[in-house]
Amino acid sequence: MATRGFSCLLLVISEIDLSVKRWV
């Protein structure tokens, strides 16, 4: 189902958010 892709997307978003906070 789409739940697997959604969780993967959330994981990627959280990782990007962490890297953004690191850069700022």
Curated annotation (Swiss-Prot):
It holds the Pfam family Humanin. GO terms for molecular function: receptor antagonist activity. InterPro entries: Humanin. Coiled coil: none annotated. One of its GO terms (biological process) is negative regulation of execution phase of apoptosis. Belongs to the humanin family. This is Humanin-like 11. The gene is MTRNR2L11.
